[in-house]
Amino acid sequence: MGRAETHRQRASERRVERNRWRASRRRSVPSPSAVFRYLSQFHDASQEEARQPRKAFIPTPNDALRGLGKVNAEMVGLVQGHIGHRQATLDMDATLIETHKQEALYCYEGYRAYQPLTTYWAEADLIVHSEFRDGNVPAGFEQLRVLRESLAHLPDSVERVMLRSDTAGYQRELLKYCAEGRDERFGVIEFAVGVRVTDEFKHEAAQLEESEWQPLPRIVGEFEVETGQEWAELGLVPTWMGHSKKGPDYRFVAVREPLRRPPLPGMESEMELSVPVMQMPNRGWYKIRGIVTNRELAGDEVVRWYRARCGKGEEVHGVLKEDLAGGRLPSGQFGANAGWWAIAVLAFNLNSAVKQLALGDQWVTKRLKAVRFALINLAGRVVFHARKLLIRLARGHPSFPLLVRAHRRIVALAHGPPQS
């Protein structure tokens, strides 16, 4: 304590205060300078010289950044060793991180940003792969390469892989790679990918008879809720899909929903900017969307399986950007920001592992705010006694049983995954 705080106190009183706070003050987190020095190791200045104006470019990660990717793969494998999923449904999605850094490039929405592309494992609630990118890099740029890297990071115990992606994944090489079984490890990869609604797509949808459109209710428990949406399969065959009679089958599923307020005359083009619409013969205006798949499920089941990804990608990116501070980029250096994002991915998977393996199923869906409230921000005392670490809480604290149960599960994890 400072002299001003102990002024006019007796020596015995000052001695009591010193003994009360005799532990020296130490940093609980690294200093900003140490953090910046650490993050600078992930930046490769030579890659910046390879950039070309107005062209999409992804810097090659250096050894340090690749090392974080290997650590993440090891963590995914550790969690998989305990939960044992045989199937991996991979959801690929990109997100925009708005920033005001001068080094950042403009995204398609017109502001400076970075745009990471993330591969999320739905069954395991883990991020398998996430590539940090500039804001001007399209979401579908080199998506096949990212998919192959994600497949390489999956644990050996995974036997089957399926893919879901928005319209950014509607790429010939990506779809053919999955449908033709080009992957040496997993073979044919079942997928459902959003389709860009082109004039040809609208033309095929307009040719369908009304009897071909099937209702698409929403399933709520054991009940079906009417949505007004309908689905139908199209006979659309793009040129690149029809080169061989022995090629894989691609199914195009269209979903339409009537517009509650049809566009005014001459305003149709403005409506196209927000959502694809089309006018059905003698039926009025509809919102129209499309999905391409190689799965053999019924069309309505394909739509529901595809829509299961909706919202989850935004939630995952929301946790990364807000809960784990991945969206608070610390530097103007691309590599430093990429390292910061990779650390946020590690924190996401660590948080998911703790919830699944230590806290229990009822905690899997809870955000980090709930975990902080119940487990982290607790008033207590940490005591070292007889070479043991003790945590003392208030008597009857509601989090006490949860902490004890989590501690026992963590100790059990030290003995390795259960033997099959």
Label the predicted regions.
Residues 1, 7-20, 24-27, 31, ...:
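Short, conserved catalytic/metal-binding motifs centered on acidic residues
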Residues 17-118:
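Active-site-proximal, Lys/Arg-enriched surface segment
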Residues 100-105, 128-132, 172-180, 202-208:
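Short acidic, glycine/serine/threonine-rich loops at helix termini
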Residues 107-157:
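Electropositive, glycine- and tryptophan-enriched low-complexity nucleic-acid-binding patches
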Residues 138-200:
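Domain-level cores of phosphate- or acyl-group-handling catalytic modules
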Residues 187-322, 408-420:
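An anionic, glycine-rich sequence signature occurring as long contiguous blocks
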Residues 302-339, 343-354:
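Short amphipathic alpha-helical "interface-anchor" segments enriched in bulky aromatics
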Residues 350-420:
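A short, flexible helix-boundary coil/loop motif
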